[in-house]
Curated annotation (Swiss-Prot):
Phylogenetic classification of the source organism: Bacteria, Pseudomonadati, Pseudomonadota, Alphaproteobacteria, Caulobacterales
Name of the protein in its database record: Small ribosomal subunit protein uS19
Function summary: Protein S19 forms a complex with S13 that binds strongly to the 16S ribosomal RNA.
Superkingdom per UniProt: Bacteria
Organism: Caulobacter sp. (strain K31)
Keywords of this entry: Ribonucleoprotein, Ribosomal protein, RNA-binding, rRNA-binding
Length: 92
């Protein structure tokens, strides 16, 4: 179920403050965040966020196409190594 339109997009307040400070100073440092639930806003375009995936901060460079999506969509939390190879077929 999607979020109600009248509520507007959710963004953690500290994330907006950090992004505004980065834009004002012109610095291109990675902004670390644990807020995977926050929506990517238009003023975040061009900034680099370090989105936490449970182990480390994955660098996410925000582009125009990402606006409206969540930060968590760009930092996968699970690593699928693939299915185990068939040992019988490998021996031949």
């Amino acid at each position: 179920m999607t979020r109600s339109v009248w509520k507007g997009p959710f963004v953690d307040g500290y994330l907006l403050k950090k992004a505004d400070a980065a834009l004002a100073s012109g610095r291109k440092d990675v902004i670390k965040t644990w807020s995977r639930r926050s929506t990517i806003m238009p003023q975040f375009v061009g900034l680099v966020f370090g989105v936490h995936n449970g182990q480390k901060h994955v660098p996410v460079s925000v582009s125009e196409d990402m606006v409206g999506m969540k930060f968590g969509e760009f930092a996968p939390t699970r690593n699928f190594p693939g299915h185990a190879a068939d040992k019988k077929a490998k021996r031949k």
